[in-house]
């Protein structure tokens, strides 16, 4: 009986702390709203690793680009926006955000 309880104690934290793609995405949005940008970036990356082929990744990559842009990581932000465009090539807001970064960096396409 003691062995079963000990086994459950070791397994329970893993289940409690495992988060779904949706939960990570929602927590990332909360962090963005609270201006906890490094934490938001980490949560978005975790969600993307969980489901790399999810169709909603265009939004996650776009949000990641926003976070990285606000952190001043322009090269990373460009890469994130480009990945977002792989999922949604005609998304005008993403195209505009990527163009704005090019302008901020003084680059032309």
Identify the function of each model-found stretch.
Residues 52-55, 89:
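Short coil turns that delineate tetratricopeptide repeat
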Residues 33-34, 67-70, 104-105:
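Register position in tetratricopeptide repeats
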């Amino acid at each position: 009986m003691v062995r079963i309880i000990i086994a459950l104690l070791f397994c329970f934290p893993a289940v409690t702390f495992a988060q779904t793609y949706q939960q990570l995405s929602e927590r990332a949005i909360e962090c963005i709203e609270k201006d906890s940008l490094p934490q938001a970036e980490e949560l978005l990356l975790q969600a993307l690793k969980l489901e790399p082929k999810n169709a909603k990744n265009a939004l996650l990559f776009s949000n990641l680009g926003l976070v990285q842009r606000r952190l001043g990581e322009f090269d990373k932000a460009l890469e994130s926006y480009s990945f977002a465009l792989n999922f949604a090539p005609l998304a005008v807001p993403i195209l505009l955000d990527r163009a704005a970064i090019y302008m901020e960096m003084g680059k032309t396409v």
